[in-house]
Amino acid sequence: MIPMLIWFIVIVLIALLACLAIKFLALRIVLALLLTLPILLSVAFCVLRRSPVQESNKAVFFNATSIISDRGEAHGSVHKNTIPAFRQAKQNGADTIVMDVRMTKDGMLIVLLPDSVDTDNATYIVDETHWIQMSQLNVYGGNNGTILTFDEAVSWCEANKMNMIWHIPSFSSDLLTYLRNKIMQDSLYDKVAVTTYNLIAAGRIRCTDRQLLMGMIWKSTEYSIVNGTAVGNMYTSWYYSMMDTFTYWGIRSLLLPSFLGVDFLVTSVDDADRALIVESSASGMRTIIYDMETATERNYFANQMELPMIVNDLVSLLGTGNSSPTTPPSSSTKANKNRS
């Protein structure tokens, strides 16, 4: 309702400006600039837009990707973003692993979802803490509670012939340089893709590397609703609603992904429909579905539409393997949950 009201006010203001422009020269100039703005934006779009990956590594990656485990399978005392979680995912049928990649203050890459870790004595923010300190934290509890390094995770996936999707929650040029060097060193262009929410990060990734597969994660309520709760108050909620409106129509029209050179869209099951999937495919963009919870959703998107899917719990959704009852381990540290 509020976004529609804002658009209505904008249209009324432009109409009022047009009426006043009949009398005032300055307003005629302003109105002319406003009316030529769409033309200028169209020209800039055509000149600055980036192309998605055209090489064969795109087909190779997606031909080998169908069941994607969301940070591994966390059953029993196993935690996500750990080697045991990756191992359980492989045993339960996954062919690809999503992992969160962050960089410490001294340039060490680690696999961790939250941007900080709380202990009884202090809070450690990842990009402000050295690896020597992070490596001593027992984040998950038990005997294997230390943080997994990026190189360890990649080595395991390579040894077990698993494709990888590296999710970048926090972007930096140093992080991108490390990822590119790792890909070139191990020849991983047909085994790796990166994903991000950040539009600026997506643009910088494509400008830097035209072979690296890049995906954009999006959801129609990404900014206005977090963990089922509305963001902001009665005075600021309109801003988050406007951001969601901008993102929604930017994605649905394919303007944003086409401009950034995105190779695939990671779309929530609530926002996915056949029209978007077909239009994306016609534009050279693949679709990956996430947030699936029912067998009906799985049958439609995975079996009928033949789309790759990101699965949080392979056992419950696909009925693969057996998981032991979940028993939360004791832990001396607690992770501050961040937006996945």
UniProtKB/Swiss-Prot annotation:
GO terms for molecular function: glycerophosphodiester phosphodiesterase activity. GO terms for biological process: ethanolamine metabolic process; N-acylethanolamine metabolic process; phospholipid metabolic process. It is found in: Membrane. The lineage of its organism: Eukaryota, Metazoa, Ecdysozoa, Nematoda, Chromadorea. It comes from Caenorhabditis elegans. Its main location: membrane. PROSITE patterns: GP_PDE (PS51704). This is Uncharacterized protein T09B9.3. Residues 66-300 form the GP-PDE domain.
